[in-house]
Amino acid sequence: MSASASTAADFVRFALDEGVLRFGSFKVKSGRISPYFFNAGLFNSGRSVGALAGFYAQALVDSGVAFDMLFGPAYKGIPLATATSVALAGHRAMAGRDVPFAFNRKEAKDHGEGGTLVGAPLTGKVVIIDDVITAGTSVRESVEIIRAAGAEPAAVLIALDRMERAGPDDALSPHSAVQDVARTYGIPVVSIASLADIMTLLQDDAQFAEHREAVQAYRSKYGV
């Protein structure tokens, strides 16, 4: 499930402008050589994170998913949940609703309030927010935390869906990591944009035409 076409297109342009999305030849976590690379860690300033949060908020609103709060898995999800909660508070579609958020620590704190959770109590329908889904480990841990608190995972919200089949080349899964998460936990995965939106840019904008063939070949081999 992706955001509206206009939101997705604007986000792809934004990611390019920020150097977060690049074309070339990159060895990615799976070991594959990818003709593009998306590094959300380069959203690293107040302005860029503020804009990113606006895209997350819009994608969540566009999705129509019913939710009560946000959860950001450590570590990448922490600033994403925080900033997106702020963006939602100012979104006109939220009508002044104040969305709480929480996140976890990697290690339990043994002083003060203690525990591994920080922020609002986990209650109701919870949206897990992260940058991408690679193996689904972060989502699994988040779902366990949310359910252990008596709350309900409502959706996973990510920046980019690579639409890429999981597994080694000689044993490719018929599904992507995103599809596996949706099937395993029975919740939607909402993305701001996807590889399909990147392909639309490559097809529509002549300045990126040189990368079109390589990305299309990669998608044909690994895409879903």
Swiss-Prot record:
Keyword Glycosyltransferase: yes
Pathway: Pyrimidine metabolism; UMP biosynthesis via de novo pathway; UMP from orotate: step 1/2
Primary enzyme class: transferase
Catalytic activity annotation: orotidine 5'-phosphate + diphosphate = orotate + 5-phospho-alpha-D-ribose 1-diphosphate
PROSITE patterns given in the database record: PUR_PYR_PR_TRANSFER
Positions bound to 5-phospho-alpha-D-ribose 1-diphosphate: 29, 75-76, 105-106, 109, 111, 130-138
GO molecular function, one term: magnesium ion binding
Binding site for orotate: 37-38, 134, 162
Cofactor: Mg(2+)
Gene Ontology cellular component terms for the protein in this record: cytoplasm
Any single biological process term in GO: 'de novo' pyrimidine nucleobase biosynthetic process
UniProt cross-references to Pfam families, sorted A to Z: Pribosyltran
Transmembrane segments: none
Key words of the record: Glycosyltransferase, Magnesium, Pyrimidine biosynthesis, Transferase
EC number: 2.4.2.10
Subunit composition and interactions: Homodimer.
Record family assignment: Belongs to the purine/pyrimidine phosphoribosyltransferase family. PyrE subfamily.
Function: Catalyzes the transfer of a ribosyl phosphate group from 5-phosphoribose 1-diphosphate to orotate, leading to the formation of orotidine monophosphate (OMP).
Name by which UniProt lists this protein: Orotate phosphoribosyltransferase
